[in-house]
Amino acid sequence: DVYCKGPDYKDHSDDITGKIDDEEEAVKSVDGEIRYTEDITFSSSSLLNKFGDVYNDSQKSFIQKMLNSQDFDKIKSKVDNLQNLKVLVVGETIIDQYVFCEALGKSGKEPVLVLRDLNMEQYAGGAAAIARHLSDFCGTVSLLSMLGEKKEHEDFVIESLPANIEPYFIYKDEAPTITKKRYVDYISKSKSLGVYSINDSQMNGENQNQLHAYLDDLIPKHDLVIVSDYGHGFLSKKTAQNISKQSIFTTLNAQINAANIGFHTMNNYNNIDCAIINEAELRHELRDRESNVDLLMKELTKSMHIKNLVVTRGNNGAILF
């Protein structure tokens, strides 16, 4: 039997994934042989990048400059070196549910849109999603997070985590596991409604003591701490100060969302090595709608003693200060 591949795989060293060697070994194990076609090749990725409307003109220009000025092997080497990192992720685990619906129309008795549910998808989001993403290129990842008192969805969360993630959970008294359910039109994929199951009051003293004991034990065992503070009652001001005083590289993301806007702030933290927020969150933090972003970044880094601040700006990219 013959296993065919395109000519771009003829030189195995050009395959950055290294999977072509595994494929050849599998073919030979069943007495097959691998052959390569000879023809003009068209890379689907290249065609999409050239002719697809994924990026605007300024983004295309930036990508082209990056391609011309950066060495891919050097970037890949930097990413590969992350394999040696031991990373601790701290933050709320959020169960993201998406109910895909068909719109039936207006109710006959009330001015209400009526939907018929078709199917539901469920994901382990929040800090669990961050940990799962990191596990792809970091060898050891620990997740310190919060679930509800009755441990709802715990099995689902654990099953969704790769083998190189070690989870540690605080079970918040008198609270459910945070669940955010969105109703989505199955054709347009636009969201019609969101329903949150959440108790976002601060954890009681016993729960906080458990969290601080975990932090004191786990932080010295890691090279990096990533804090994802969703403002749902897991990380109090005292906890933020506890994390800030640790002598370890600490990265912070403190998000604004529908449940915490007006009450959530980054200023509980101090001496952060790297903070990542979007422009709206930066302006919200400083109560400033109009000033230049660069000036606001300078003000925030000075007031919170942030060494590196990244502000994302949607299709305008990101700024590092």
Label the model's feature ranges.
Residues L88-V90, G194-Y196, D223-I226, T251, ...:
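Structural motif
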Residues D8-D11, T93-I94, I198, Y230-G233, ...:
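Short glycine-rich anion-binding loops that position phosphate/pyrophosphate groups of nucleotides
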Residues I95-I226, Q246:
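Conserved N-terminal subdomain of the carbohydrate kinase-like
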Residues Y9-D21, C101, H232-K238, E285-R287:
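Glycine/threonine-rich flexible loop motifs
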Residues M66-L104:
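Positively charged, low-complexity intrinsically disordered leader regions
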Residues K76, K237-F321:
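Conserved phosphate/ATP/ADP-binding segment of small-molecule kinases
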Residues V87, V141, P167-Y168, T250, ...:
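Hydrophobic anchor at the start of a short beta-strand
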Residues D1-N68:
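Nucleotidyltransferase catalytic core that binds NTPs
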